[in-house]
Amino acid sequence: MSDTSDLVDGKWQRLPPVPEGMSKSQWKKQWRRQMYEAKKEEYAEVRKEKRKRAKENRRKKIQEYIDRGEEVPAELKREPRVNRDQVASGINIILDCAFDDLMNDKEIVSTSNQITRAYSANRRASQYANITVTSFNKRLKERFDKALDDCNYPQWQNFKFVSDEKLITEGDKSKMVYLTADTEEQLDTLEPGMTYIVGGIVDKNRHKLLCYNKAKELGIPTRRLPIGEYIKIEGRKVLTTTHVIQLMLKYCESRDWKESFESVIPSRKLDPVKEKEQQQQQQQQQQ
């Protein structure tokens, strides 16, 4: 298509004339934002309808398992919104959101959604973590202050937001671990008193080594979750921020990575080959 057109809602639309003093790329970004604001209510209705259909589909699937006399998979079971019997896990988690300028508007929305899901997971966990979102500023903060203003994020328990990244740059590096898929060293366990940093970025793998290089520059040790042990993923083994948080919370409860992955990750992504190898090893040890 020509440079005077832009893709909006899956359709090519003619771009209005570029205002004086503004580049074409700047105008495209601003125009997309204006189009989004104009159709925000429509988008909200579409999301509401999708959630309704997903809820109905979930109920049908659960009923099918019940009718067959089979156990309902954990991924279909809905946990209570708040776990009243929570205890502290002793670990700290930092969501490093210093990558605002590297994401487009849709990726900012996705990042904000993952943060809200991480908060929900922390509320439901049997052992909660102290979670802090650093570099909470620019478009991400604007998103929470405007579009998500009803979530009351400043009052979230065990979940803080700070505008700078002093916790990362000035904290005790000997008690920090930056989690990144780009390192060779694997994370074996989670230790109370340690702080685990997770990159708060949605970039579709555009910025490889981003978190790894930042950690190295700051002198922070890097580790990767044992993803390859249990998940079948092509290329770089990268999980969403939400999944990383959920896995860590589940591990604090079970102290078992295998059980944690099976509980958090959809079964279609789990690696049946690795599972079979482990079963064979266990059988050989028992003989």
Curated annotation (Swiss-Prot):
Top EC class for this record: transferase
N-terminal signal peptide: none
GO MF annotation: an example: tRNA (guanosine(9)-N1)-methyltransferase activity
Biased composition (Basic and acidic residues): 268-278
Subcellular compartments: Cytoplasm; Nucleus
UniProt xrefs under InterPro entries: MT_TRM10-typ, MT_TRM10-typ_sf, TRM10/TRM10A, tRNA_m1G_MeTrfase_euk, tRNA_MeTrfase_TRMD/TRM10
Family annotation (CDD domains): SPOUT_Trm10-like
Renumbered residue ranges of the record's region Disordered: 1-27, 268-287
Binding-site list for S-adenosyl-L-methionine: 179-180, 199, 203-207, 211, 225, 237-239
Active site as annotated: 203
One GO biological process term: tRNA N1-guanine methylation
GO cellular component, one term: nucleus
EC number: 2.1.1.221
Superkingdom of the organism of origin: Eukaryota
Predominant localisation class: cytoplasm
Catalytic activity: guanosine(9) in tRNA + S-adenosyl-L-methionine = N(1)-methylguanosine(9) in tRNA + S-adenosyl-L-homocysteine + H(+)
Stretches assigned to the SAM-dependent MTase TRM10-type domain: 79-272
Keywords: Cytoplasm, Methyltransferase, Nucleus, S-adenosyl-L-methionine, Transferase, tRNA processing
Family: Belongs to the class IV-like SAM-binding methyltransferase superfamily. TRM10 family.
UniProt function note: S-adenosyl-L-methionine-dependent guanine N(1)-methyltransferase that catalyzes the formation of N(1)-methylguanine at position 9 (m1G9) in cytoplasmic tRNA.
Record note on quaternary structure: Monomer.
Protein name listed in UniProt: tRNA (guanine(9)-N1)-methyltransferase
Gene that produces this protein: TRM10
